[in-house]
């Protein structure tokens, strides 16, 4: 089974969210439909990009790294490259 580390962008606010899941479509739908959760405040969300990992453990470690202090520079660079790719068409 494949696991995904993904980046979402809030359409109205421009905020970013990084997460991990085994079902990317279902997870995006949850972010856009749930009420009362942190991510529901800034919906709708759009998928900017994702990475595919072969194990849940690898994906979880990657998500934690990107969300942590040690991954801040890498996180910013990844988001920047995704935004540039989106702007290029």
Describe each model-derived feature in a short phrase.
Residues 1-89:
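Structure-specific nucleic-acid interaction/processing domains
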């Amino acid at each position: 089974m494949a696991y995904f580390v993904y980046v979402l962008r809030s359409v109205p606010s421009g905020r970013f969210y990084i997460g991990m899941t085994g079902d990317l479509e279902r997870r995006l739908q949850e972010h856009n439909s749930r009420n009362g959760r942190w991510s529901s405040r800034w919906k709708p969300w759009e998928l900017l990009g994702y990475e595919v990992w072969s194990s849940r453990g690898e994906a979880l470690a990657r998500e934690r790294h990107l969300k942590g202090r040690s991954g801040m520079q890498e996180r910013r660079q990844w988001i920047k490259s995704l935004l540039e790719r989106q702007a290029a068409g």
